[in-house]
């Protein structure tokens, strides 16, 4: 595995860099705009592999994406290779339909320490929940970013990441009440502790999320990529685009259903993804939102 190949994959062309917040932010933004957050393997009859070598091959060499256990694992490796002080952490995702956090640790995220300050770095939550900048590990501090305001709160050594969102305009009235549309302006995202983790700690989650009938990844196919203006998602056979702040304090959210014949072209043009096997889009009862 070669860090230069990773830099080429994300379009990062700075041969001389400083291990500071500006560099960390730049790497995060390059990765999130070139590497999709996706689970397409599962809907092409393939497994989501946890190993770093397999992840590097899929994302860097084959120019695919992956889910958090792959995409953030790659980011953790790259930042460590660059010389950043990194710690792998595990998160518990907030499940909106049941109004509670997952009982299992199913999200991988990264902590980076710079000049005695700690930051949460996450390139693989996807949709409009994706941070565009590292979030400083400071309890109760509102941290405005392009997608939304992010807020971390610490209670009894557990940290909670929340998001304060803008109003939104949906031109296609067919989707105003759709489950694909995030309707909360205050959104809980996930919780985590600062206990260091290894990739082996996620083996159960990697299996569970691929086989459980209540796993959103089993129920729904998705592909999400951040853009210069917002985010583009393919959820099942619906393409959704959110433009952040298209006017003051309002996001524009557009939806369009695409035919099976259009899917391959959408994946190539919107996400830069070419699949080796036949893809069967799926949007079940458990779905993602934008």
Curated annotation (Swiss-Prot):
Stored SUPFAM superfamilies: Cysteine proteinases
GO molecular function, one term: arylamine N-acetyltransferase activity
Keywords: Acetylation, Acyltransferase, Cytoplasm, Transferase
E.C. designation(s): 2.3.1.5
Subcellular compartments: Cytoplasm
UniProt binding sites for substrate: 106-107
Pfam families cross-referenced by the UniProt entry: Acetyltransf_2 (PF00797)
Function: Participates in the detoxification of a plethora of hydrazine and arylamine drugs.
Protein family per UniProt: Belongs to the arylamine N-acetyltransferase family.
PANTHER family to which the protein is assigned, alphabetical: ARYLAMINE N-ACETYLTRANSFERASE 1, N-HYDROXYARYLAMINE O-ACETYLTRANSFERASE
Identification of the protein by name: Arylamine N-acetyltransferase 1
Biological source species: Mesocricetus auratus (Golden hamster)
Organism lineage: Eukaryota, Metazoa, Chordata, Craniata, Vertebrata
